[in-house]
Amino acid sequence: SEILAVTFTNKAAKEMLARLQNMIPINPRAMWVGTFHGLCNRLLRLHHQEAGLPATFAILDMSDQLGVIKRVMKANGIDTEEFKPREVQNFINRCKEEGKRASEVYSKFSKDKAYIQIYAMYEAVLQREGACDFAELLLRAYELLSRNEMIRHHYQERFRFILVDEFQDT
């Protein structure tokens, strides 16, 4: 199918799929309908090698992500009282949502510099362990499509109709 439909929640994705099925006589499996994270996961699973991921990469939820951050900080002797793991987590996710890897983040503030170092160590752990957090799914998919012309062209040709539900809310 030539339809890509994306939304923010699983519930909204199911509703969107049901609406599309009622409107269009197409096998629903042929359409790509889901959340941003779900569709990015699908894309990365199909093109895991090009995205630099193992075929069976794990997805970390927020709790798992925080656990990895704490492990990184402990292994590197970083004081979790001075640098709160949840603040580090928010910093990392904000950077990824802005499309920035640790190597692309700059700051003149010492606290941010420490966060950037933790972010870099965290990235290395995820890469070594073959894992992605939620923000990483979006960033890797963006990087894959922006850097790989052949894959980007394939999806530009495949999807003639792109529906974004609740786009005005972004």
Task: Write out the residue ranges for each language-model feature.
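Conserved helicase NTPase motor core
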Residues: L4-A5, A12-A13, W32, D61-D64, ...
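Short acidic/histidine-centered micro-motifs embedded in hydrophobic/aromatic stretches
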Residues: F36-L39, V88-R94, K108, R140-A141, ...
